[in-house]
Design a protein with these regions (language model features):
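Short hydrophobic alpha-helices and adjacent helix-cap/hinge residues
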Residues: 1-248
Length: 248
């Protein structure tokens, strides 16, 4: 799924930037990249490599200006103000929370979003076929993903019955609903848990898992959980709870 998202993402950006052959001006186009996580985010390296594969090499014929909120969503207004001040030519943003903040802060710079499960229900765009104003992007929603993840958990734990599903309260419930539906289809008992950012109460979430005797944990590919993946991993290890993270 990630490769498919990146392919469309890079192609979208490619249409917005001049090709190296057509670029005769001395000014090098600037591309802003904004994510809610930290610099260790694998998607940024894939983003930069994807642009290079299309002929847009950072430091040669484009300049990439990466910014990472590191889980502090209150930083978004300042981040976008800074990038507007740098006169970036296009903004690439990941996640619904980031896309909403970009939409609010920027009106005259092309915005390309990715890793948004449901752009309409997440209040990123009003219409998928005709996105608002300066917005375009791709959805990462694939209902089959939950089935594959749950089947993998069952292979690891043949006795699997109760699976906790941890999601982000700040985005739509599309991925959570699909995961619950697929769990029931596999005769599993899902436990819905949603935490709110930027400082989620993960201790309470894990206490609820212990109370319900969860056999395993499925962590959804949603913003606040990507930011706090290390803390989730540590709590799961402490409880000796088998955990599967979606790629991020």
């Amino acid at each position: 799924m990630l490769s498919r998202v990146l392919t469309v993402f890079m192609l979208s950006l490619g249409f917005l930037l001049p090709t190296s052959e057509a670029q005769q001006v001395t000014r090098i186009p600037r591309v802003g990249f904004v994510a809610p996580q930290g610099r260790s985010l694998p998607l940024f390296d894939a983003f930069r490599q994807g642009l290079a594969n299309l002929g847009y090499v950072d430091g040669q014929n484009i300049l990439i200006e990466p910014r990472f909120a590191e889980g502090h969503y209150e930083r978004f207004p300042g981040i976008f103000a800074q990038l507007v001040g740098l006169k970036v030519d296009v903004l690439a943003v990941t996640g619904a929370v980031t896309a909403r903040a970009a939409k609010k802060a920027v009106s005259d710079i092309p915005l390309v979003f990715s890793v948004v499960v449901d752009p309409v229900r997440d209040n990123v765009v009003a219409n998928l076929r005709q996105p608002d104003g300066n917005l375009t992007g791709v959805t990462c929603f694939d209902p089959r993903q939950a089935t594959k993840q749950l089947k993998l958990l069952r292979e690891i734990i043949p006795s699997l019955r109760r699976v906790a599903v941890l999601g982000d309260q700040g985005v739509s419930e599309a991925l959570m609903n699909a995961s619950e539906e697929q769990a029931r289809a596999l005769d599993l008992q899902p436990q819905r848990l949603r935490v709110a950012g930027p400082n989620p109460d993960l201790q309470a979430a894990f206490a609820a898992m212990r109370q319900q005797h969860a056999d395993a944990l499925l962590v959804l590919e949603e913003p606040v959980l990507g930011v706090h993946a290390k803390e989730v991993s540590e709590l799961a290890a402490k409880d000796r709870l088998p955990t599967l993270f979606a790629p991020s």
